[in-house]
């Protein structure tokens, strides 16, 4: 039985040195009045470092300066069955382009991972709001050199069915949205997905894999425009405590633009947040992520799959790529609560459920709402450590369980959703 185990060992001295060098940025980080809270009574990892290494504590408060940028950096080493030992450096940049009423926080998130199995993982995710909130700019750029496990199509596969594949991957997705009404934006963009050096490394001998049956080619290209309708009433996307998010995205892939084939995809995503109890800082969060493909045949590696959303977070409790199919339905709920009243430590409990189009319907290209495989649930719990009390960036460490013996640790800089 393959068990997905991921353990991160943090490097406090390096983390502390990076964060203390950023304290000048912290002290000038100005929280807009509509987002302000009593930061003097809140504590984060930088405050802990100050209390240990500084004789005289320097209050980190709003100075009213124009600079409103904060950087959180997290170096770590990790281990998983999929990566072996890995060196990881994550960074989260949060800032406001203005202090007007209703101004949203802008974020830039990146990391670099190099693993024992010579995997390279380099994502860059941006969510930038203009000064007046009229425009929103989103980017999802990734480069991967990624030997990894795949398990076939549908949700009736077993962990023992997994085998290694290898490929290189470049994703460049860019989108710009314009405000239509309050919190409502319409947008368009351009997507490029390029795979090369695709190969199977350890398939069962004498058995044709789902990958081969579906279509295994050494190179795959998908190019096309994207059209989106976005509603976002959250004020802080790093650690939301209220508001909601709804994204409807249509992405056709077109041969005349350079795609290998014509096909289409539709994404319907919802996130909602509510304080519970209402007078507390505890939050109930709900996430629904649903992807559908139609009008052609997507590459195997671009089919909806566990853990392949833009933030690589669906399916806690399951290894990335555990399930795959033409269509995907996903639902997750999480309860976030304080452990310490100063906000330094928190906790979560979560549960999720996912289903995909079955193997035969995906292979035959006739998937519909009637051809979904059995639902696969997951659940777990985690801790939160406040890295920055101004941007509300948390270090998130979760342990999840899934069906069929799946289990593992998930680590994030910023909330999972």
Residue ranges of predicted features:
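Bacterial Sec-dependent N-terminal signal peptides
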Residues: 1-28
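Short, contiguous acidic/charged loop-to-helix segments that flank catalytic cores in large enzymes
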Residues: 318-324, 365-373, 400-401
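Transmembrane beta-strand segments of outer-membrane beta-barrel domains in Gram-negative
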Residues: 24-60, 140-142, 148-283, 356-360, ...
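C-terminal outer-membrane beta-barrel translocator/porin domains of Gram-negative envelope proteins
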Residues: 236-345, 350
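Residues on the lipid-exposed face of transmembrane beta-strands in outer-membrane beta-barrel proteins
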Residues: 75-77, 89-93, 124-128, 172-178, ...
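Short loop/turn motifs that connect adjacent beta-strands in outer-membrane beta-barrel proteins
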Residues: 57-69, 97-105, 131-136, 182-183, ...
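Gram-negative/organellar outer-membrane beta-barrel architecture
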Residues: 63-73, 77-221, 321-322, 392-407, ...
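C-terminal hydrophobic structural anchor segments
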Residues: 339-378
């Amino acid at each position: 039985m393959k068990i997905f185990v991921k353990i991160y060992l943090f490097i406090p001295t390096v983390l502390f040195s990076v964060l203390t060098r950023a304290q000048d940025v912290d002290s000038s980080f100005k929280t807009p009045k509509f987002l302000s809270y009593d930061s003097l009574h809140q504590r984060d990892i930088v405050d802990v470092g100050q209390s240990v290494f500084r004789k005289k504590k320097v209050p980190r408060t709003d100075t009213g300066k124009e600079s409103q940028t904060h950087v959180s950096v997290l170096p770590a080493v990790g281990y998983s069955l999929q990566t072996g030992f890995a060196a990881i450096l994550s960074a989260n940049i949060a800032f406001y382009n203005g202090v007007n009423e209703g101004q949203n926080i802008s974020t830039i998130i990146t990391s670099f991972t190099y693993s024992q199995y010579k995997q390279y993982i380099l994502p860059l995710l941006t969510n930038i709001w203009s000064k007046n909130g009229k425009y929103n700019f989103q980017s999802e750029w990734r480069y991967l050199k990624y030997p990894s496990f795949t398990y076939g199509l549908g949700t009736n596969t077993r962990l023992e069915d997994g085998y290694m594949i290898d490929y290189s991957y470049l994703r460049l997705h860019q989108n710009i949205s314009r405000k239509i009404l309050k919190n409502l934006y319409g947008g368009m963009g351009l997507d490029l997905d390029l795979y090369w050096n695709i190969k199977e490394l350890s398939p069962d001998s004498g058995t044709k894999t789902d990958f081969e049956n579906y279509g295994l080619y050494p190179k795959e290209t998908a190019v096309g425009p994207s059209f989106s309708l976005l509603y976002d009433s959250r004020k802080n996307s790093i650690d939301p405590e209220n508001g909601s998010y709804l994204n409807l995205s249509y992405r056709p892939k077109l041969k005349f633009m350079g795609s290998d084939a014509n096909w289409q995809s539709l994404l319907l995503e919802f996130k909602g947040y509510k304080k519970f109890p209402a007078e507390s800082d505890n939050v109930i969060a709900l996430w629904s992520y649903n992807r559908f493909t139609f009008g052609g045949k997507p590459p195997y590696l671009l089919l909806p799959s566990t853990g392949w959303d833009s933030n690589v977070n669906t399916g806690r409790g399951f290894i990335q790529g555990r399930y795959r199919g033409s269509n995907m339905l996903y639902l997750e709920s999480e309860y976030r609560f304080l452990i310490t009243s100063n906000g330094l430590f928190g906790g979560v409990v979560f549960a999720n459920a996912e289903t995909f189009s079955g193997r035969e319907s995906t292979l035959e290209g006739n998937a519909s709402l009637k051809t979904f495989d059995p639902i696969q649930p997951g659940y777990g719990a985690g801790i939160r450590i406040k890295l920055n009390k101004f941007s509300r960036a948390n270090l998130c460490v979760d342990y999840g369980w899934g069906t069929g013996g799946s289990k593992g640790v998930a680590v994030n800089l910023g909330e999972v959703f």
